[in-house]
Amino acid sequence: MMRDDRAVNEVVGFILVFSLVLTTVSLVYAAGFTGLDNTRDVERVNNAERAFDVLANNFQQMGRGEAPNRATEIKLADAQLTTTAERNVTVNASGTNATGADSTAIRYDTTGDTNIVYEHGAVIRNDSDSAIMRREPDFIFEDGNVVVRFIESRGSGQGIGGSASTVLVRAERDTSKVLVNNGSSPSNISIRMQTHEDRAQVWEDYYEEQIAAANSSWSGDCDDRNSSVGGSDTTRIKCDPFGADKLAVSRVKIQVTLT
């Protein structure tokens, strides 16, 4: 009888130990794969961000006349790449005609809350409600000089995702034009820019910092927003006027095709 009880106890003990081991292995397995998935997703976004930096550099080379065309490969996995509707940006000054560009943004959207955008020469990453400018546009604001090189990317309404693993962003330089070249201390320089509401604060911060670097006596801001201009999800920011010793504005049109 004692042997039977001992045998039963051993079986029960084995079952309990086996169940504990199985539960532990299952938890470690699930946690491990969740961690691997998170690591994979983070690395995918980081790779996309690096690809956008390459794209911005390629566009900058075309903007400076260093290349007639460029192609940039971006890996998608479960993400989607689109070109947005065109949004307007202008630079005005006393005694000059209004100058600007109507440019489409290139946007990478993950399955989560992160997106990366190339817009007017800048690369902006947005995580949920937090946006940061990873790469600044090819503008110069310093020591009284303001040089704005508009990269006017064209080709709105395109989108690739789903089963596509990679996208090739083909860009070809179209036309270039010097819009303003004023070295006679232009005054009342004003910047107006349409952007997605999620990126408005980033652009406000950028322009405020840059204008202050060009004109140390400027005490204005760029927080004058108008959400009734430019359509859905678009807001227009406006900077208070400022002066400079020199203002130069150019525009290069670049045709964008996603394949």
Task: Identify the meaning behind each predicted range.
Residues 1-71:
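Hydrophobic alpha-helical segments
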Residues 43-107:
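Short N-terminal edge-element motif at the start of the domain
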Residues 96-246, 257-259:
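Intrinsically disordered, low-complexity regions enriched in Pro/Ser/Thr/Gly and acidic residues
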Residues 252-255:
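Hydrophobic alpha-helices of bacterial signal-transduction systems
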